[in-house]
Design a protein with these regions (language model features):
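Long, contiguous, secondary-structure-rich segments that constitute the structural scaffold
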Residues: 442-495, 597-599, 604-606, 615-616, ...
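Long, C-terminal catalytic modules of enzymes
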Residues: 415, 422-523, 528, 535
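Extended redox/cofactor-interaction regions of prokaryotic respiratory oxidoreductases
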Residues: 1-33, 37-39, 43, 68, ...
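Long, well-ordered, tryptophan-enriched scaffold segments
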Residues: 47-198, 286, 444
Length: 832
């Protein structure tokens, strides 16, 4: 999320690639505000939804073809000279020269230079291939800097390679692949690209509609590249709007409820590659960009984990930190496959319902029935908590010993949430939890203290870190003061810290005001460096919780810096140096955000010059535009520029591939699927796939969410006022397909895939239309995924079959997210 939802009102054009009006209705107010001010709204979605109803143009496209669409837009912008050249030359790697040995997918039939066999995976090419990236690099000059061609004409320049790569993505090709009529695509391309540039800006929204694919990361890259090409990053009314699925997805990501990272997006060490702290920091710290500070953030994190026990002599406790055995072994899908195979013995499930909500849920339930024990912490007895009651399962055959811990919902606890726009907001409880129910913080601290008592006196090295870790926040060990938890996340001084003149800057224990003050020598501790500044502390020790600030936006501060705290540094639009030209002047007066004022008071009394404006500068506010790196906005990259050329696991440029299950051959190249996507081979028909052109599974299916329900239904199926809003589980089917297979609105239908089947009611609608794909009619249906076998007994419609029983265990090769937005199915009348 590069921007702020409030700023969407400044957009000249908004492209919603997801169903924002229904799934993010509060944030959608800013889309409507922009529309009131004259902005055009484009909705790109296979289904006509409430978002479509208030948009100027609805663009239905076949699920799984987003890269073809975005690639077509980039090609259109370049071919019609609609890209923002000054921005592109100044702030991106478009002018950088690439190794002449590199070949694009245009040259190699849909592949990139360097595809190799790994020697793993047997005959399955999807686990047996990887890319050798040795030619995916810049040409360097004698000083080790990338060579550049500012004219963008050199055939080895990123720009020319980009142009060549997307030269195949013509309006005609987009029509053949996506099913978007050529005339409509050209209209949309002209509208979006024509409303971007020096004087105008556009923004694009996305959510799981783009991520849940076997090229999910490349979908997002394609979107970002389009925004870079048009000069829409770091500027008012521009940006990339990543819409989160519920109130604290962003916070969970920041604090890293992820397998491969530590809080603050620090890489999780690998056992073999990072045997000691020195090696880890050397390998994971780049030579340029803001991540040169990674040692400060990482050592401060270790100090937050292990306190006084973390010293320079013991690598600040680095050896106590768990290490990954492999870079690709611990994702959600890896874990459940290993669980099914008996490699995982126990499972602690806190606030998740994988029996319903995850991919290939049938596999997940079977896996959870094979454990030694499982703990579920939730506010209701979910399908996961009672997985032994899965319909068709004999409880006597379930091996797993189950423990259920009732949890407290948001209204029963204090704490913070970090929402879509990186905004950390505080909430206070309305009532206490009933009976013996504990808040999350209480439960975790009580559990940790109990385990520490069990392990007290252990002489094993592996136990020392856990025994040293602090789980006491306040005077009552098992009743943590959550503001003190936030203070630890924010960061604090572990000893008195003086400046170079000997003046006291921080007293021991005082909260840090900025992550700039973090150190790599153990003098600071901090649980998540990007949150530093959310807590301030007065000299007398009083905490000032900025997450609890409530000043609404006004004319002087439309970005509402006085409302809560946005990481990093309360900055609302990141990369905002890009809102001004090389000289520090706004590209446009009506799009100004920050600018260089040469007469403003400088960093010291004897100097002048400072970046000023409407937001917190995303870099050193006193760094002049003509100073070294004063013209580089993308500070989190080592080369400080936005990346068109970015070597990921499946290519340096996004390339269209068909979903693993598809109704058509790849019309763009000979390479059908992502060559390095992950597909698991499993016994017992747990992950069978529909072959290309299968007559048994001829229809495309996509899954989605509803306004009236929440995720796997735990927060909605148990509440009558929400559960009654839909009569039953349903499948959306076009009028054309319904007529073809003899289905009427309200009929029961069976939707099946090679993995499983569900029964639902048919919702026959004109909101879905068949696609014409290369002259062939392709039908697509849509099925929400909120239902499970539990719900309100008096409302039978609150219960239903599990949509995710239909999906497969396949994954994107970079982050291993599932492909649940595009796969193949069959639809038959009745219960079959």
């Amino acid at each position: 999320m590069t921007t702020n939802l409030i700023d969407m009102q400044n957009s000249d054009v908004i492209m919603c690639t997801n169903n924002m009006a229904e799934n993010h209705p509060v944030g959608f107010q800013w889309v409507m505000k922009a529309k009131e001010r004259g902005a055009k709204v484009i909705h790109v979605d296979p289904r006509f939804t409430r978002t479509s109803a208030v948009s100027d143009i609805h663009v239905p496209l076949r699920s799984g073809t987003n890269i073809a669409f975005f690639g077509g837009l980039m090609s259109y912008a370049m071919q019609n000279n609609l890209y923002f050249k000054d921005y592109v030359v100044s702030f991106t790697n478009a002018s950088f020269l690439i190794d002449p040995a590199f070949k694009t997918a245009t040259d190699l039939g849909g592949l990139f230079e360097g595809l190799e066999q790994t020697g793993k995976g047997g005959t399955d090419p999807h686990v047996a291939q990887t890319y050798n990236k040795s030619s995916w690099k810049y040409q360097l000059d004698g000083e080790g800097n990338p060579k550049r061609d500012l004219t963008l004409k050199d055939p080895s320049s990123v720009f020319q390679l980009l142009r060549r790569h997307y030269s195949r993505y013509t309006p005609e090709m987009v029509e053949r692949i996506c099913g978007i009529p050529k005339a409509k695509f050209v209209e949309v391309a002209g509208l979006y690209c024509g409303n971007s540039g020096r004087e105008k800006t556009g923004t694009i929204t996305y959510a799981l509609n783009l991520t849940q694919h076997t090229n999910g990361v490349q979908n997002i890259r394609a979107l970002c590249m389009l925004q870079l090409l048009l000069g829409n990053i770091g500027r008012p009314g521009g940006g990339v709007v990543a819409l989160r699925g519920h109130a604290n997805v962003q916070g969970a990501t920041d604090l890293e409820v992820l397998y491969h990272e530590l809080p603050g997006y620090l890489p999780m060490p690998l056992r073999d590659a990072h045997p000691d702290l020195k090696t880890y920091l050397e390998k994971e710290t780049p030579k340029g960009g803001f991540w040169v500070n990674r040692p400060k953030f990482f050592v401060s994190l270790l100090k937050a984990f292990y306190g006084d026990a973390a010293t320079k002599e013991n690598e600040f406790g680095y050896q106590w930190l768990p290490k990954r055995a492999s870079a690709d072994a611990y994702s959600h899908q890896h874990t459940f496959v290993d669980m099914y195979k008996g490699k995982v013995k126990a499972f602690f499930c806190d606030g998740q319902n994988p029996a319903v909500g995850g991919p290939n849920a049938k596999l997940a339930r079977a896996a959870m029935q094979r454990l030694d024990w499982m703990v579920v912490v939730d506010i209701f007895l979910t399908e996961t908590a009672e997985v032994w009651k899965t319909p068709g399962t004999n409880p006597k055959d379930v091996k797993t010993e189950m423990f259920f811990i009732p949890a407290a919902p948001a209204a029963e606890k204090d704490g913070s949430l970090t929402n879509t726009m990186r905004l950390i907001q505080w909430h206070e409880k309305s009532v206490n939890p009933p009976g013996q129910v504990q808040t999350d913080a209480q439960f975790i601290c009580t559990l940790a203290h109990g385990l520490q008592k069990m392990y007290a006196g252990s002489k094993k090295d592996r136990d020392k870190g856990f025994l040293a870790a602090n789980f006491t926040y306040g005077e009552k060990p098992d009743h943590p003061e959550v503001e003190l938890v936030l203070k630890e996340i924010n960061g604090f001084a572990t000893e008195d810290i003086n400046d170079k003149d000997g003046k006291l800057v921080y007293k021991k224990g005082q909260a840090l005001s900025t992550f700039v003050h973090m150190t790599d020598d153990g003098k600071t501790a901090g649980g998540c460096w990007i949150y530093t500044g959310v807590i301030n502390e007065t000299p007398d020790g009083k905490l000032v919780n900025k997450a609890n600030a409530h000043k609404p936006p006004d004319e002087k501060d439309y970005l509402a810096h006085g409302w809560a705290f946005a990481w990093p540094a309360n900055r609302r639009i990141i990369y905002n140096r890009a809102s001004a030209d090389l000289a520090g002047k706004p590209w446009s007066e009506k799009k100004k955000l920050i600018w260089w004022d040469p007469e403003a008071p400088g960093q010291t009394p004897d100097k002048k010059g400072k970046w000023v404006g409407l937001d917190v500068p995303d870099f050193n506010a006193f760094l002049a535009p003509d100073a070294k790196n004063g013209d580089k906005p993308f500070i989190m990259r080592a080369d400080l520029v936005g990346a068109f050329f970015g070597p990921l696991n499946d290519g340096p440029f996004p390339e269209h591939y068909e979903p693993i299950e598809s109704p058509t051959r790849n019309l763009l190249s000979k390479q059908q699927n992502n060559p390095v996507a992950k597909i698991w081979s499993l016994p017992d028909q747990k992950n069978d796939l529909a072959p290309l052109g299968s007559k048994d599974y001829p229809y495309v299916i996509t899954t989605y969410r509803l306004t009236e329900h929440h995720l796997s239904g735990v927060m909605s199926r148990y509440l009558p006022m929400l559960a009654e809003m839909f009569e039953s589980h349903f499948a959306e089917i076009s009028q054309e397909l319904a007529k073809e297979i003899g289905i009427a609105n309200g009929d029961k239908v069976t939707v099946s895939t090679p993995r499983g089947k569900i029964v639902a009611k048919a919702m026959v609608t004109h909101r879905l239309k068949p696609f014409q794909i290369d002259g062939k009619t392709v039908h697509q249906i849509g099925v929400p995924w909120h239902w499970g076998w539990k719900g309100v007994d008096s409302l039978p419609g609150s219960k239903g079959d599990i949509t995710n029983d239909l999906s497969a265990t396949v994954a994107d090769p970079t982050v291993y997210i599932q492909e649940t937005k595009a796969f193949m199915c069959n639809v038959k009348k009745g219960e079959v």
